[in-house]
Amino acid sequence: MSLFDHKITELKQLIHKKEIKISDLVDESYKRIQAVDDKVQAFLALDEERARAYAKELDEAVDGRSEHGLLFGMPIGVKDNIVTKGLRTTCSSKILENFDPIYDATVVQRLQDAEAVTIGKLNMDEFAMGSSTENSAYKLTKNPWNLDTVPGGSSGGSAAAVAAGEVPFSLGSDTGGSIRQPASFCGVVGLKPTYGRVSRYGLVAFASSLDQIGPITRTVEDNAFLLQAISGVDKMDSTSANVDVPDFLSSLTGDIKGLKIAVPKEYLGEGVGKEARESVLAALKVLEGLGATWEEVSLPHSKYALATYYLLSSSEASANLARFDGIRYGYRTDNADNLIDLYKQTRAEGFGNEVKRRIMLGTFALSSGYYDAYYKKAQKVRTLIKKDFEDVFEKYDVIVGPTTPTPAFKIGENTKDPLTMYANDILTIPVNLAGVPGISVPCGLADGLPLGLQIIGKHFDESTVYRVAHAFEQATDHHKAKPEL
């Protein structure tokens, strides 16, 4: 049995009883990485020297002081688009191949305040653009459940590392499903918080109105622990919300009697695989057995979500990625005769194909002749999608459906068909457009590959999302299933 089979509360008890040391946890993490990461390829950079030194320091603090951080001694992996001082941050892109940040992201600082131990940086789709982690310039991360399949994306490294037992917890980012989709594919728990719940300061921007950092864990309880540690307003991020952070752990009561669940017919219709549909219907029976009720509803504008998302996110990416020019930091071409040539060649050589595709799409949508027809119209449709969610939440407590239309697909299966690849996020994208919280929890297997149940809540009501997810988790054994590596 791995130490990482224990929850945070159990690990903290073992530490305080002196049955294990924090150094043991860190050692377990690096040993596991050494044993399996040549197959999984989740990590891009390790911070072993600093992590081991910090673990020893925390070991001495077990008796040395009475107050300890919320995540005292817990090893964690961080997605490679979250800046870490003194630890290379590349966004899995050649254009940032040697970028060594001079500051920590707010979430990293909050992890340090909670006394977590950063193990290393995790692979991802370049600049978080992708659904399979096949767009990384450095590594091809594989799904621990089947090494021939993708782990999902863009936080594929974050989900795969937790599923493979390399770290018990990780941070990812979610712009259109990039935490929930890989969590579903890898059989772990992943939450996208409400937009503004967690500071984005130090998150390398893809689409600033959609990006949100969130936790990936083995259990719902651990997920709530991590969100507790990283949530809250931040003066360095004007989009972080000045709202109270509730005690998320207190919501894990297991009691969902009388809870009203909405199930959108669009989430179980055309394009959703039989296995995903059946796993959700089975999950609804479990929730009914716990005292909740459910009804079918409609989110009529969700059929426009995919097009809306790719217009808006690509437009924002076009603006955000303009800063990578070969002048200030990152990669610079050697094949330029003048300044304009330097810009062109640096970006042509430094960005991968998917990133260039989205920059071009965004630049086109923002151009003078097409702004009203595309970008402005997409903003209007986004408002309608948000209104659909608001209307449903007037009557219901949560929305439930599959996280993904299918389980993980084979590596290389969709790389030549961007539209098929984009459709993998069709059930997660509306949640980002509406800015509401959503979680994926394991709800079964199809041909040996995990499936995820998506639970969506009202703005800043992660507590109810956690309550439902935890009740389902406790009533089933899906979260106990682990891949054999």
From Swiss-Prot:
Class of the enzyme per the UniProt entry, highest EC level: ligase
GO molecular-function terms, A-Z: ATP binding; glutaminyl-tRNA synthase (glutamine-hydrolyzing) activity
List of catalytic residues: 79 (charge relay system), 154 (charge relay system), 178 (acyl-ester intermediate)
A Pfam family of this chain: Amidase
E.C. numbers: 6.3.5.7
The reaction(s) this protein catalyses: L-glutamyl-tRNA(Gln) + L-glutamine + ATP + H2O = L-glutaminyl-tRNA(Gln) + L-glutamate + ADP + phosphate + H(+)
Entry keyword NAD: no
InterPro entries, sorted: Amidase (IPR000120), Amidase_CS (IPR020556), Amidase_dom (IPR023631), AS_sf (IPR036928), GatA (IPR004412)
Keyword Protein biosynthesis recorded: yes
GO biological process, one term: translation
Cystines in this chain: none
GO cellular component: glutamyl-tRNA(Gln) amidotransferase complex
Domain of life of the source: Bacteria
Keywords tagged on the record: ATP-binding, Ligase, Nucleotide-binding, Protein biosynthesis
Family of this protein: Belongs to the amidase family. GatA subfamily.
Subunit structure: Heterotrimer of A, B and C subunits. Interacts with BrxC.
Alphabetized NCBIfam families for the sequence: gatA
HAMAP family on file: GatA
Role according to the record: Allows the formation of correctly charged Gln-tRNA(Gln) through the transamidation of misacylated Glu-tRNA(Gln) in organisms which lack glutaminyl-tRNA synthetase. The reaction takes place in the presence of glutamine and ATP through an activated gamma-phospho-Glu-tRNA(Gln).
PANTHER family in alphabetical order: GLUTAMYL-TRNA(GLN) AMIDOTRANSFERASE SUBUNIT A, TRANSAMIDASE
Name of the protein this chain belongs to: Glutamyl-tRNA(Gln) amidotransferase subunit A
Taxonomic lineage from the root: Bacteria, Bacillati, Bacillota, Bacilli, Bacillales
Underlying gene: gatA
